[in-house]
Amino acid sequence: MPVGGGAPVSVQSMTTTKTADSEATITQIYALAAAGADIVRCTCNEPAAAEGLARIVPRSPVPIIADIHFHHEMALAALEAGVHGLRLNPGNLRKEHEIKQVASEAKDRGVPIRIGVNAGSLHPDLYKRFGGATPEALVESARMELAYFEDVGFGDVKISVKASSVPLMIEAYRLASETFDHPLHLGVTEAGPPPGGLIKGTAGIATLLAEGIGDTIRYSLTADPVEEARAGRQLLEALGLRERKGLDLIACPSCGRAEIDVIAVAKAAQQALEERKLPIQVAVMGCVVNGPGEAREADLGIAAGRRRGHLFIKGTIVRVVPEDEMVDALVAEAERLVAEGIDARLAAADAGAAAEAEADRRDLLAGKGVDANASEERIELIRKKYGNHAEG
């Protein structure tokens, strides 16, 4: 997902699950992607979280950013896990040699880093020097971190200068846009619950975007992060910065429960749907156990089970079709959905579809087990190896 350089403004959000719980985290990532998130950030605060990232990254439908505080070793572990990017907080990760070590490793791996300055965790020296968390102090914090990166020849950088005060945030980003040539990640941090948090986030982010400042955004809400992703996407569409003209297809990368060749079905569905230029979100999921739930935010989806496909709209099963008709049925339903609307298609659902899906779900669990991907086995191994390395 390109950021800056003329690329469309992207939407970010952050998971609220424990990253070590990879199953819960990947479920939330799918929900965020379906709601409009282009990039998702996960905390990496302990070795178990890094182990979780190693399982999450290859299964994620969107790029994963590791959020790092205090411990540079966790940044290195996240890089080992294969993350697509890092966020470092210069307010609590302060040692020059550690920062340079992370930047050097990221450079070698071709992984970008966001310098994530936050008014609430500003370095005490800067707070004293500037008489508080001023726009100048926030920008200087980013500049100092950037200088460390430049010393090791690392330049694949994004910058954020967030604050919970909307006026402070706006002025800090205006100054940052005059100071840096790097992409800017916009956000009002700790904005609080909706509706107040939405109002504050929109006031800050929209003001800057309307001025041509900002390359990627995140609403920081005390709420289900799906609300963050949805708000971000809606804001960009309202400002004319993103327009859904065609298909937005998400698909699981398959797992031990998959009843179909997910890749083949996804490719066939994508080709057929793109030819029709339908402006909807469609999900192709490998099994009916978690598929409709993981992709419940998609307009339409299909999940496999017992040699047949289960069509769902916004997570609600509406029809069951033979396996060899899955793609055709998905395309036909997509055309009807665009023509008639979600409510009309939900009203036309087959009465027995949900019961058939539940029967298939139970059969799959009975046949392949609850832990088909051996996640519990992996978690137990992580506990044995890294249980004594808790964050301190």
Protein language model features and the residues they cover:
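Peripheral terminal and linker regions in Fe-S/redox and tRNA-modifying enzymes
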Residues: A172-G392
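Alpha/beta enzyme core
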Residues: M1-C42, E46-A66, F70-P183, G201-E211, ...
